[in-house]
């Protein structure tokens, strides 16, 4: 750097400090190539010229007067304005290195390289962190300039000229001018019309001193032309245009008159073109609408002048293109597409770019754009974006007097999403209501179509398709609809049901199909997470899950609609998010990009402010601490979850009515058109697509549990075996088997109908009662069931299974959460349905086992009477049918929870809540109900019922032996319980006579059960053929009497098994029962031959969740039923139930609603599998002997609350169990005491269960390995898993499960808990 006194150039040998690798080092100039440039001003004309020093005479010093050699060789006086040393110096450093440098890299040796005040002592080091930033201002004379003073003087003197030029330019701004220029090609003067614009329009084009910037009308290009070549065009001075310029000239005149923009100054905004950002921005704004929920971006509704936006963007993009800075990419700001027109208007409203000086104003502009403020640079970023894209255009428009409609969007920019969502929800609700009404009408129309089987098939298909199409919308609407709307729809459904009853069972069947389809979708939704969790425990479940996921995709819309109902943070909102774990946990500011609801939990896709988008992730709502803006209230997402749970509960309720409806359909068809209608219905279902037929038949049969249970045991076992293979390999096999079973069932049904029309009539009566109850209780459920049925037709068996599981889970959740009144309703429905379906099943059993029809008729009539009594009880305000049933519900729920030890605590909480609710209702209704029950039933029976710990006593009649007397007592007890709770009825009738006991005993039991359990009891008795060859006939009787005892386990279970049953915890028994029921359901669904048995077991295992449990059980159950065909079936079921329990526990942790239902379904399915595997040997033999009997175990499981227990031990005697207690004692207690006692018992059961669980886990692993091998073999050969391996596993399971079986005998309790 040169000081003022430095020489103009340096000479050789001068000691200098030379810059070497960034530092100044001592050196000496070795050679110099001198070149000094001198800028001088001649005195005579004040002109300035730059010459070399060899043309100058005089001292080379700034301000000196010298003589300068002119171009012509003459010398003239001039003053040196500036000296520039451009010499090249070669220097030698101390170490001998040489380097050639410019003067700027040299300074005289000894020169201080810092200012006087720049010592560290004097530096004001106010900010040590910024030590590198210079505190002292930079030197003014940087570079090679020796002095700036003369230059400043000259520039200041010339500022006047600049002002004059600016004035002239300002006068021309916006004027239409003609520009003269010389064409080099044609070598003649040319001109073109142009518009004078502000030089600030273009940064790319340098506008010189005497030039102005114009935009040509000819090609739209911007050019800088000399001021002297521009002439304004006026009406007087109009040059004659060439032919080439005619159009441009016309456009110029048009612009001069009306400011009409020429076409070539606009660009067509095409999607493909690089400058087609207008439409793209519109799309971006649409995206912004969706993302931000801010309707301010909706151009169609909000933009006051939508055409103006297009006009603006067309001109803007063309302008940017013509000036050489095309917009090739969408403008983005804050990870959002930038609405340039809106930004332009916002800045215009504030007076233009130059008038905005405060960064706070720019930040406000940023917020007004609707973009979430990510960081403190928001204002700067929007300012830069404006300068880049719009500043030049703003100057251009100002100078050219081009105006736009600058009205801003009419609505508030940051509109709360809730309003929008509410509007959308309202609209959706309205549309949904209309859709539901349409569907109801469709179902009505379907009834007349059912007159002929062929027409039924074709029309059904047509009806099912539209119902499927509107399924999603219906499901979406259901949650959104208010209770009043739901009630209205329920009444409509009831009316439809009545019409269907009149017309025949066909219409009901169709409704059931559609209901099942809807139910399945609902199940798929609630069960998505459940299925995922079940992956870990069961490969079979994994296959089902895959199909569920496919269904889930269809259900995404439904979920989205549900989300709208939930209170969610709107996209774009900034929130504080917890990130990391433990000590590393930090709080980050994030903006919400999207939200979703999964499994009752709100999920958010968040973008961490200031972080790359690759860190965007989905987080749970609990990770959000609070909104970044403290003024925004924090949303309680628990409310959302509750809402979702409620919705799921509603769906579950709907689903259980669906089951009732389906069962009713089957019964009513039998009643009105006994054999022909049922056959036609089944045939129609079979005639439908193979998948549809299988699925529908399976679900219908599972719903009609009795029907499926009545199928031949041989068919069921075969179908189960096939199912195992199919689950492993393909669902298609299951479908074919299901069709086969459906046909066989149809035949059986027709036979039964012919043999016992009176039974059908009784069943019809029961069905009507149950249906009426169900309809009144849960019309929505019926609706969903109908829709689910139609869906089932489309979905494969696995879908059905997963859906069933979902239903089970939903029911479980509903049970826990919903008042017991709802549970009671469900139980009635399920019980009635079981009874209804059970009667057909019984008919089949009769025909197969040649049992006397009179016994069935008597049992059906008795069951009908019981159902009537139950319906009366239901009609009473004490929906809880009895304190007993309510208690049972609570007990079932608790036992169920304890069954899944891991989830036990959560479930206990749920149970406690539900128990409290139920108990509140019970306290009111118990007296009336109890008095009515006492009047209806003998004291002896009541004692038995309640001594079993409510349901336990009923569930396990006298344990001692399957004596007929004991069976009858148990049946009576069950009947009493059933009168209290239709679910109990269902469960009890199912087990009827499982084993090969004398037919006489069976009819007796059946008749007793019929009286006790109207139709379901009789059905189950008739349907239950000897479960396993091992089980003696006496055991069968016992099972029939116990009906709740595990039918799967051969009645002749050894005393050890009985002991095990007694020992087994209620939870385990519930699980086992559930699994048995699931297996039975699976068999039923596969064979579609014994729906009654399955339904009974399902209803008994979980009275509230009969249908959901049945579906899941049907899935795993089918596979397991194949295995279960031996005595080992119960043991295998136990194994599976334990597995399921583990899985279910995990699931429980994830979601309360889904977890409960999942646990039930999983546990049940596991138990079923275990039982099935142990049973296979016996079952197979029985199948050959009496196929109906195989299904009877399922029925047994169904038969009553005891079903779970009965299912596994197949013959649980009415033993007093370790965890049993008197119902009367419970009634005397307060709700709190009752809960505490139940909790204590559950804890005991849980401890016992945990001891069994570890043993079962190892067996399960072994079973899984065996199953994999079996699947591999099954893939090649359609044969099911080898009976030997299944039987072995079953034997091991039985050994382990003995205690669990004993607990299962406590089914009454477990049923109540459920």
UniProtKB/Swiss-Prot annotation:
Residues 306-398 form the ARID domain. Expressed in Sertoli cells of the testis. The modification Phosphoserine is found at residues 276, 295-296, 482, 666, 668, 675, 717, 778, 790, 1016, 1031, 1154-1155, 1157, 1161. It is found in: Nucleus. InterPro entries: ARID/SWI1_ChromRemod (IPR051232), ARID4A/B_PWWP (IPR012603), ARID4B_ARID/BRIGHT (IPR028853), ARID_dom (IPR001606), ARID_dom_sf (IPR036431), Chromo-like_dom_sf (IPR016197), Tudor (IPR002999), Tudor-knot (IPR025995). This is AT-rich interactive domain-containing protein 4B. Acts as a transcriptional repressor. May function in the assembly and/or enzymatic activity of the Sin3A corepressor complex or in mediating interactions between the complex and other regulatory complexes. Plays a role in the regulation of epigenetic modifications at the PWS/AS imprinting center near the SNRPN promoter, where it might function as part of a complex with RB1 and ARID4A. Involved in spermatogenesis, together with ARID4A, where it functions as a transcriptional coactivator for AR (androgen receptor) and enhances expression of genes required for sperm maturation. Component of a Sin3A corepressor complex consisting of SIN3A, SAP130, SUDS3/SAP45, SAP180, HDAC1 and HDAC2. Interacts with ARID4A. Interacts with AR. The modification Phosphothreonine is found at residues 793, 1028, 1152. Residues 1132-1150 have a biased composition (Basic residues). Disruption phenotype: Embryonic lethal. Lethality occurs between embryonic day E3.5 and E7.5. Heterozygous males are fully fertile. Double knockouts of ARID4B heterozygotes with ARID4A homozygotes show various hematological abnormalities, which are more severe than the ARID4A phenotype alone. Hematopoietic stem cell (HSC) and common myeloid progenitor (CMP) counts in bone marrow and spleen are increased. Lymphocyte numbers in spleen are significantly reduced. In peripheral blood, red blood cell counts and lymphocyte counts are reduced. Residues 1013-1023, 1164-1186 have a biased composition (Polar residues). Residues 277-305, 531-567, 788-800 have a biased composition (Acidic residues). Residues 439-464, 486-511, 643-656, 722-754, 778-787, 808-817, 841-853, 997-1012, 1058-1067, 1198-1210 have a biased composition (Basic and acidic residues). GO terms for biological process: chromatin organization; establishment of Sertoli cell barrier; genomic imprinting; negative regulation of cell migration; negative regulation of stem cell population maintenance; negative regulation of transcription by RNA polymerase II; negative regulation of transforming growth factor beta receptor signaling pathway; positive regulation of stem cell population maintenance. It comes from Mus musculus (Mouse). Residues 123-169, 266-306, 439-577, 635-678, 709-888, 943-1215, 1256-1290 are annotated as: Disordered. The keyword Coiled coil applies. It comes from the Eukaryota. CDD domains: ARID_ARID4B, Tudor_ARID4B_rpt1, Tudor_ARID4B_rpt2. GO terms for cellular component: cytosol; mitochondrion; nucleus; Sin3-type complex. Residues 572-624 form the Tudor-knot domain. Residues 1030-1051, 1089-1103, 1274-1290 have a biased composition (Low complexity). There is a cross-link at residues 428, 461, 751 (Glycyl lysine isopeptide (Lys-Gly) (interchain with G-Cter in SUMO2)). The gene is Arid4b. One of its GO terms (molecular function) is DNA binding. The C-terminus mediates interaction with mSin3A corepressor complex. The N-terminus is involved in transcriptional repression by HDAC-independent mechanisms. Residues 1227-1272 form a coiled coil.
């Amino acid at each position: 750097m040169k000081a003022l006194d430095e020489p103009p150039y340096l000479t050789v040998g001068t000691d200098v400090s030379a810059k070497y690798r960034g530092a100044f080092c001592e050196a000496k100039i070795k050679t110099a190539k001198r070149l000094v440039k001198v800028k001088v001003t001649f005195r005579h004309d004040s002109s300035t010229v730059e010459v070399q020093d060899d043309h100058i005479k005089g001292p080379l010093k700034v301000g000196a007067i010298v003589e300068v050699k002119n171009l012509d060789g003459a010398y003239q006086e001039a003053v040196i304005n500036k000296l520039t040393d451009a010499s090249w110096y070669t220097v030698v450093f101390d170490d001998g290195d040489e380097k050639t440098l410019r003067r700027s890299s040299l300074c005289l040796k000894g020169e201080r390289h810092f200012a006087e005040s720049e010592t560290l002592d004097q530096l004001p080091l106010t900010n040590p962190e910024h030590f590198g930033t210079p505190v002292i201002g930079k030197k003014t004379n940087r570079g090679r300039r020796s002095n700036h003073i003369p230059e400043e003087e000259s520039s200041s003197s010339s500022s006047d000229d600049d002002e004059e030029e600016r004035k002239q330019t300002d006068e021309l701004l916006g004027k239409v001018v003609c520009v003269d220029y010389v064409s080099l090609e044609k070598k003649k003067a040319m001109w073109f019309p142009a518009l004078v614009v502000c030089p600030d329009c273009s940064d790319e084009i340098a506008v010189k001193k005497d030039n102005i910037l114009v935009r040509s009308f000819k090609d739209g290009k911007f050019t800088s032309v000399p001021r002297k070549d521009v002439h304004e065009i006026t009406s007087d001075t109009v040059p004659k245009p060439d032919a080439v310029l005619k159009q441009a000239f016309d456009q110029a005149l048009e612009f001069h008159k009306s400011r009409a923009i020429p076409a070539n100054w606009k660009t067509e905004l095409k999607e493909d073109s690089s400058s087609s950002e207008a439409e793209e921005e519109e799309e971006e704004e649409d995206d912004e609408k969706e993302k931000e929920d801010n309707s301010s971006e909706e151009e169609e509704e909000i933009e006051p002048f939508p055409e103006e936006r297009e006009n603006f963007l067309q001109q803007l993009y063309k302008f940017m293109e013509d000036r050489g800075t095309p917009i090739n990419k969408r403008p983005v700001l804050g990870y959002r597409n930038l609405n340039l027109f809106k930004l332009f208007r916002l800045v215009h409203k504030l007076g233009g770019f130059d008038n905005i000086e405060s960064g706070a104003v720019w930040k406000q502009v940023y917020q007004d754009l609707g973009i979430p403020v990510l960081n403190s640079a928001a204002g700067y970023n929007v300012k830069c974006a404006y300068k880049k894209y719009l500043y030049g255009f703003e100057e251009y428009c100002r100078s050219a007097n081009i105006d736009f409609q600058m009205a801003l969007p009419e609505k508030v920019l940051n509109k709360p999403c809730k309003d929008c969502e509410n509007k959308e929800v309202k609209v959706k609700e309205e549309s949904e209501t209309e859709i539901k009404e349409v569907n109801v009408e469709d179902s009505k129309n379907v009834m007349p179509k059912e007159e002929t089987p062929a027409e039924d098939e074709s029309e059904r298909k047509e009806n099912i398709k539209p119902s499927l199409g509107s399924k999603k919308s219906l499901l979406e609407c259901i949650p959104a609809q208010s209770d009043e709307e739901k009630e209205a729809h329920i009444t409509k459904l009831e009316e439809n049901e009545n019409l269907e009853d009149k017309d025949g069972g066909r219409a009901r069947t169709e409704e059931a199909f559609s209901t099942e389809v809807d139910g399945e979708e609902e199940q798929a939704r609630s069960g998505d997470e459940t299925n995922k969790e079940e992956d870990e425990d069961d490969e079979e479940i994994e296959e089902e899950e895959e199909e569920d996921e496919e269904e889930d995709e269809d259900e995404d819309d439904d979920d989205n609609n549900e989300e709208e109902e939930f209170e969610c943070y709107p996209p774009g909102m900034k929130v504080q998010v917890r990130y990391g774990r433990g000590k590393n946990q930090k709080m980050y500011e994030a903006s919400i990009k999207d939200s979703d609801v999964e499994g009752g939990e709100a999920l958010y896709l968040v973008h961490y402010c200031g972080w790359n988008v690759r860190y965007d992730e989905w987080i749970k709502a609990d990770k959000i601490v609070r909104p970044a803006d403290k003024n925004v209230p924090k949303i309680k997402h628990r409310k959302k979850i509750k809402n979702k749970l409620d919705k799921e509960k509603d769906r579950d309720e709907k689903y259980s009515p669906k089951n009732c409806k389906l069962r009713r359909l089957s019964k009513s068809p039998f009643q009105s058109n006994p054999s022909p209608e049922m056959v036609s219905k089944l045939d129609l279902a079979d005639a439908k697509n193979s998948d549809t037929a299988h699925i529908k038949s399976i679900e219908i049969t599972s719903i009609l549990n009795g029907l499926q249970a009545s199928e031949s045991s041989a068919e069921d076992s075969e179908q189960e075996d096939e199912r195992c293979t199919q689950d492993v390999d393909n669902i298609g096999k299951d479908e074919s088997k299901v069709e086969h079973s459906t046909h066989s069932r149809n035949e059986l049904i027709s036979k039964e109908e012919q043999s016992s029309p009176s039974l059908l009539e009784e069943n019809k009566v029961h069905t009507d009662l149950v249906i009426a109850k169900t309809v009144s209780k849960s019309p929505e459920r019926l609706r969903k069931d109908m829709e689910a049925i139609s869906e089932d037709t489309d979905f494969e068996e696995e879908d059905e299974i997963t859906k069933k599981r979902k239903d089970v889970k939903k029911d479980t959740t509903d049970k826990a959460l919903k008042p017991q009144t709802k549970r009671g309703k469900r139980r009635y429905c399920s019980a009635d349905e079981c009874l209804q379906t059970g009667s057909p099943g019984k008919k089949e059993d009769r025909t197969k086992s040649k049992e006397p029809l009179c016994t069935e008729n008597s049992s059906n009539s008795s069951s009908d009477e019981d159902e009537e009594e139950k319906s009366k009880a239901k009609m009473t305000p004490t929906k809880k049918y009895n304190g007993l049933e309510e208690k049972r519900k609570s007990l079932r729920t608790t036992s169920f929870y304890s069954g899944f030890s891991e989830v036990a605590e959560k479930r206990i909480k749920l149970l406690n809540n539900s128990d409290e609710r139920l108990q509140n209702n019970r306290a009111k209704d118990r007296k009336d109900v109890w008095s009515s029950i006492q009047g209806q039933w003998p004291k002896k029976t009541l004692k038995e019922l309640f001594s079993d710990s409510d349901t336990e006593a009923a569930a396990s009649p006298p344990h001692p032996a399957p004596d007929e007397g004991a069976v009858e007592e148990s049946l009576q007890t069950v009947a009493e319980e059933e009168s209290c709770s239709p679910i109990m009825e269902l469960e009890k009738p199912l087990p009827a006579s499982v084993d090969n006991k004398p037919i006489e005993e069976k009819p007796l039991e059946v008749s007793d059960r019929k009286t006790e359990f109207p139709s379901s009891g009789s059905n189950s008795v008739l349907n239950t053929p000897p479960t396993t060859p091992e089980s003696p006939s006496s055991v069968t009787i016992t099972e029939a009497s116990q009906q709740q005892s595990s039918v799967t386990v051969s009645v002749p279970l050894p005393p050890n098994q009985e002991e095990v049953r007694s020992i087994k915890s209620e939870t385990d028994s519930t699980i086992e029962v559930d699994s048995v029921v699931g297996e039975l359901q699976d068999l039923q669904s596969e064979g579609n031959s014994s729906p009654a048995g399955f339904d009974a077991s399902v209803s008994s295992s979980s009275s509230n969740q009969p249908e959901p449990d049945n579906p899941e059980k049907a899935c795993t159950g089918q596979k397991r039923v194949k295995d279960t065909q031996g005595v080992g079936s119960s043991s295998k079921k136990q194994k599976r139930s334990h597995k399921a329990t583990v899985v279910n526990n995990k699931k429980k942790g994830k979601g309360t609603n889904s977890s409960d239902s999942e646990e039930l379904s999983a546990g049940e399915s596991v138990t079923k599998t275990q039982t099935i595997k142990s049973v296979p040997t016996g079952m197979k033999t029985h199948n050959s002997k009496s196929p109906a009997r195989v299904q009877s175990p399922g029925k047994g499981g169904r038969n009553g609350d005891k079903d779970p227990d009965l299912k596994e031990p197949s013959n649980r005697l009415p033993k007093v169990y370790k965890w049993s207690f008197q119902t009367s004692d419970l009634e005397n207690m307060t709700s709190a005491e009752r809960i505490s006692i139940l909790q204590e018992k559950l804890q005991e059961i849980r401890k016992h269960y945990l001891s069994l669980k570890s043993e079962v886990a190892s067996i399960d692993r072994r079973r899984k390995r065996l199953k994999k091998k079996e699947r591999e073999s099954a893939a090649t050969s359609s044969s099911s898993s080898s009976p030997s391996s299944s039987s072995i596993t079953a034997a091991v399971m039985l050994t382990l499960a003995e205690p669990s079986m004993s607990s299962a005998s406590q089914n009454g309790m477990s049923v109540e808990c459920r």
